[in-house]
Design a protein with these regions (language model features):
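Terminal accessory carbohydrate-recognition/targeting modules of carbohydrate-active enzymes
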Residues: 52-485
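Bacterial Sec-dependent N-terminal signal peptides
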Residues: 1-54
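Short, intrinsically disordered, charge-balanced linker/junction segments flanking boundaries
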Residues: 49-52, 691-699
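The feature captures the catalytic groove of carbohydrate-active enzymes
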Residues: 422, 426, 430-457, 558-566, ...
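Short secondary-structure capping/junction motifs at helix and strand boundaries
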Residues: 35, 170-175, 582-592, 603-614
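Substrate-binding groove/exosite segments of carbohydrate-active enzymes
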Residues: 417-420, 473-596, 603, 647, ...
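Extended, well-ordered alpha-helical scaffold segments
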Residues: 452-470, 485-493, 540-553, 586-603, ...
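Active-site-adjacent bridging/hinge elements
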Residues: 411-414, 502-512, 542-550, 626-638, ...
Length: 699
């Protein structure tokens, strides 16, 4: 029997067919009764292999996107206040937020800010993120609280359950403030062209290639996955330009693919740019036209045009080659007729955060229409003692609290720098040891769709509440008896993990949803997100896969991977864990070449990587981030000593382990040449650590 257990365990751990010959020999050498048992065991193991080998990751996730595409348009994406968000258009960098803010009537008001402690907690979020609960603690511990649960019903609707609980021996008078508002990417373009314009616009950052003469260490690893020379500015029509020394050196060149439409075979190309006052940036233009482009500087954005002619409509190239006179900020270029280009109008774009508000007859709902958003949004609630208000201030945590005693005004006017549409439900009187659940509906769509959903909510609320279902894959069912005592803590950890996701984050020319180590870090973070992926593996395999994929790039990309922070190979650790947990050959194959590209760059095999130290062969990453080992409590070593000769041991050690992981994957995928390369790297780095990792001076 010991041999049987050994065989089963070996098979389960390896999932490799090489165990089968050993099992077959054991069957042949056994008596009939044992053979029957072993044959049954063999059938079970085949079933286990088949089940474990199936991909649990949807085919739609095997893309080049850096977004967590398996998420819904609704989710906890806000960078301001805890609640539910809706993304009307992933490309726009715009987000609609809705937050419930409980409090005591004319007394303490909770403002659940996501950036600091504010008496709310991510309480229970299921793995699919279709049910999101926050607890608002008004009197410690569990004496007076409100649990707000967002049930995502479909792409148009989220039902909100607000359970107010009084566990004290006296009456409690509570309030619920429902806040709706629009939010944007932090720096929005201040200018636009008319929507009915008869011209084509091309962003300068949408190039097919951008080749500077001087290749910096960041040539194949642009920070945050941005494009080369990409720079954010509100003066741009898109929010981003080619700047940061673009065109500074003679021979710098950028290429574009343009599409000439029928009837536009002859026209003008108008370049929008900003060159410093008194300077001129010049380029040779090739491709669709041969010309010399002079971008004379005024210190402001201007448009200069050159003619083009082509025989027929279709795709053409446009190449700009710098003459090295001076750098410029290139916003992009227009294509149109000579008359159209001459009449280009650049209009001011006012950031619109004040909606048109239409309240219902019962004053228990309102519909919002924001100028910059095509969607309508509707809010409805089933509590009669309520008032619809507007709050005009950008800091609710101070201004709104000051207005706690103003329970009469319909407009609370502060600095007018932001707008919140507010449903004020008050008072909610709770008898001793009682609770009350109030429901609200947040919906989106066309004006007609939103009106219909609101009417259904008021007329037949039970149809919505009946849609609330328990999770089909309840996590508690998967916990062993001895682990039940840890379930509360595990649930809170899962909720914290899944609530730390934000939108929008900009990378690779797109806005994405992104899991963060905390919403204070409103950015990418490479090694932190590797650890987040490790945690997600035990929560949701698909999200874990997408979290790893988000930091990889297709082979041959401008950036070897998405880099922010200390460049450690934690994505490779998550890759190994994902493989062990899923046995997904598809995931193994898809991620392997991307992670190999990551690994090759960090071990100095990319010709533009500067990680390999001359002489020792150890790895150092000072050119890519100040803190090579990721320590937050030590000063950066390169600032204290010569960065050319000092490097932390941990960097090389990390990539030895990464090499061992990728070697296993290469063996599984049959890449014999890669296996030899990894073995060589392991040997080189291991040998280098022995003589060069001891510092006599520091001991």
């Amino acid at each position: 029997m010991d041999n049987l257990y050994f065989l089963l365990n070996s098979f389960y751990l390896s999932k490799k067919s090489k165990v089968l010959p050993l099992l077959q020999r054991t069957i042949l050498n056994s008596n009939m009764k044992t053979k029957q048992s072993l044959m049954m065991l063999l059938m079970i193991m085949f079933w286990i292999t088949s089940a474990l080998g199936q991909s649990t990751i949807p085919p739609s996730c095997f893309t080049d996107s850096h977004d967590i595409t398996s998420l819904q348009a609704w989710g906890p994406y806000s960078k301001r206040y805890a609640g539910i968000s809706h993304i009307p258009d992933m490309k726009a960098g715009m987000r609609f937020d809705f937050s419930v803010m409980p409090g005591y009537y004319r007394n303490r008001q909770l403002i659940p800010h996501v950036l600091f402690e504010s008496s709310y907690y991510p309480w229970d979020i299921n793995s699919s993120m279709s049910r999101i609960t926050y607890r608002y603690e008004m009197e410690w511990k569990d004496r007076v609280f409100t649990d707000v649960t967002y049930y995502i019903l479909d792409e148009h609707r989220t039902l909100v359950g607000m359970n107010c609980v009084n566990n004290t021996a006296v009456n409690q008078n509570l309030v619920l403030n429902l806040m709706a508002y629009i939010d944007y990417e932090e720096e929005q373009p201040q200018f636009k062209i008319p929507e009915d314009s008869n011209i084509q616009w091309h962003n300068a950052t949408d190039y097919t290639s951008n080749e500077p003469v001087r290749k910096s260490p960041q040539y194949n690893l642009v920070y945050d996955g941005w494009n080369r020379n990409e720079m954010r500015t509100s003066q741009s029509l898109s929010g981003f330009v080619l700047g940061k020394g673009f065109g500074r050196d003679k021979g710098d060149k950028v290429n574009y693919e343009i599409n000439i439409l029928p009837g536009k075979e002859k026209g003008m190309i108008g370049f929008r740019y900003n060159t410093p006052k008194g300077k001129t940036s010049t380029f040779q233009v090739k491709g669709i036209t041969e010309s010399r482009l002079e971008l004379q500087g005024t210190g402001e954005y201007n448009i200069v045009s050159i003619p083009y002619t082509c025989k027929e409509p279709g795709k053409y190239t446009l190449e700009l080659i710098s003459e090295g006179t001076h750098s410029t900020d290139l916003d992009g270029f227009f294509i149109g007729s000579e008359e159209d280009i001459k009449q280009i109008k650049i209009l001011p774009r006012k950031l619109s955060f004040i909606p048109e508000i239409k309240s219902g007859k019962t004053k228990q709902d309102f519909i919002l229409k924001y100028p910059e958003c095509d969607n309508y949004y509707g809010i409805a609630w089933n509590y009669q003692e309520s008032q619809i208000r507007e709050v005009l201030d950008n800091n609710l945590e101070s201004f709104f609290r000051k207005k706690t005693h103003d329970h009469v005004s319909s407009r609370l006017i502060g600095n007018r720098e932001w707008h919140y549409s507010n449903a004020f439900l008050r008072p909610i009187v709770l008898a001793p040891h009682s609770e009350q659940t109030i429901y609200a509906l947040v919906c989106t769509g066309t004006s007609q769709q939103v009106n219909e959903q609101i009417q259904k909510f008021h007329s037949t609320p039970e149809t919505l509440t009946s849609l609330i279902q328990k999770d089909s894959n309840n996590s508690e069912d998967r916990i062993l008896a001895d682990g039940k005592k840890y379930e509360f803590g595990r649930r809170l950890l899962q909720s914290a993990l899944l609530s730390n996701i934000v939108y929008p984050v900009h990378t690779q020319g797109q806005y994405i949803r992104h899991f963060t180590p905390g919403k204070n870090w409103n950015s990418l973070y490479t090694w932190d997100s590797g650890f987040i992926a490790l945690g997600l593996i035990d929560v949701d395999i698909t999200k874990a896969f997408e979290c790893i994929r988000a930091y990889t790039t297709p082979v041959g990309s401008e950036s070897a991977f998405i880099h922010h922070g200390t460049p450690l190979p934690i994505q490779m650790y998550a890759y190994y864990d994902l493989w062990n947990n899923t046995q997904s050959k598809e995931a193994l194959q898809f991620l392997y070449p991307r992670l190999k590209q990551f690994f090759d760059f960090m071990t100095g095999k990319n010709p533009y990587s500067t990680t390999r130290m001359k002489g020792s062969g150890l790895l150092r990453t000072w050119d890519y981030f100040y803190n090579s080992g990721g320590w937050d409590d030590y000063p950066p070593q390169h600032a204290l000593r010569d960065k050319a000769s000092v490097t932390p041991v941990v960097t090389s050690a990390y990539y030895i382990r990464a090499a061992k992981i990728l070697r296993l994957a290469a063996k599984e995928l049959g890449f014999k040449k890669d296996v030899k390369e990894y073995e060589q790297t392991i040997k080189q780095l291991s040998n280098a650590l022995q003589p060069y990792s001891w510092d006599k001076e520091t001991g």
